Amino acid sequence: MGTVLEPHELQEPDGAAVEAFAGRAFGDVAGTMATVMCAVGDKLGLFTALDAGGPATAAELAARADVDERYALEWLRGLASAGYVEQAPDGRFALPPAHAAVLAREGGVMFLGGGYQELAGMLPLLGRLGEAFRHGGGIPQSAYDDDAYDGMARLTSAWFDHHLLGRWLPLLPDLEARLDAGASWADVGCGAGRAVIRLAEAYPRSTFVGYDAFPEQVERARRAAAAAGVGDRVRFETVDGAHGIPGTYDVVSTFDVVHDAADPGALVAGIRRALNDDGTYLLLEMNCADDPSANVGPLATVFYGFSLLYCMTTSLAHGGAGLGTCGCPAPVVRRLGEAAGFGSVRELPIDDVFNRFYELRV
């Protein structure tokens, strides 16, 4: 039975303030509709067809993408109204190059197609999320479909394809030299294995293993490694890092994993035990403020939304800490590291909008 609230006098709102906020809220609804249309365009290859073939009428785009012309026209008009595509007087629609970099060109640093796919895979679980609000608990990883996980991998791929090797590891030249010579690396919470595969391609003398608690993700990673041709120095296993990590390693990494963990303290302690005495733990976490009240603006809104839809709820589904996407700022990282026995917790200056990167040493 819910708490009975004491009646109180409702304040009469300022009319101008109501109108201003209503405009803002309606703008968010419009953005949601644009996101839905983008998710459809990403799934059906409409953006790539428009980008690759150039300006097109609805009939031409429908032929390129093998979709119904009437649906193509409504989609084009909808995204033209949002300013995502441009419409010419002759009835053709175009995707400007700057927009194509975000919407059509897979693998680019600014590409957002994976985010649209991930969100489309999570929204069908809103009913279960409401039940968790009412009764506690959460949504387990097994409840999410391929769109959620494939989208997640696509959204974060730029971090590993561009930043990990090109910007982040160069901040640790001694570690790069060690990897060149041959070292052992375990990535805990490896997901679809993108980071491990890129590392194996760059450092053929080193060996890499990816661990994930979710068997379906491990299978995705194995398929990706086979396709990349790095199976001779990469393996993936189903392991919950909080319950212990097999073997010892020169490097252990977690890439935006600790805030998802049911037991973050046990996870970081398990990583400490799995490190050689001269080893390095590389910890990537979301770029959030130390004070939760300072997490404001569009980026924080996206973080909290994904936290409700996945990060926090999957932890709570296992009776976990439920830190959430913004629950692992620098003070929490330092506290977890020190409690696990790390003598040095150093934040590296990666200057990244989404992430903060830490080096932990014994």
Task: Give a label for each model feature.
Residues M1-V36:
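N-terminal leader segment of winged-helix/HTH proteins
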Residues A58-R64:
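A short acidic, leucine-rich amphipathic alpha-helix
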Residues G341-V362:
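Core SAM-dependent methyltransferase catalytic element
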Residues L284-A339:
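C-terminal alpha-helical "lid/dimerization" subdomain adjacent to the S-adenosyl-L-methionine
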Residues G265-D277:
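A short glycine-rich, Lys/Arg-flanked "PGG" loop and its adjoining helix->strand segment in the class I
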Residues L50-G54, A200:
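Short helix-to-turn junction characteristic of helix-turn-helix DNA-binding domains
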Residues G27-M33, M37-K43, T48-A49, L73, ...:
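Conserved Class I S-adenosyl-L-methionine-dependent methyltransferase catalytic core
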Residues P124-H259, P264-A266, L284:
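Conserved adenosyl
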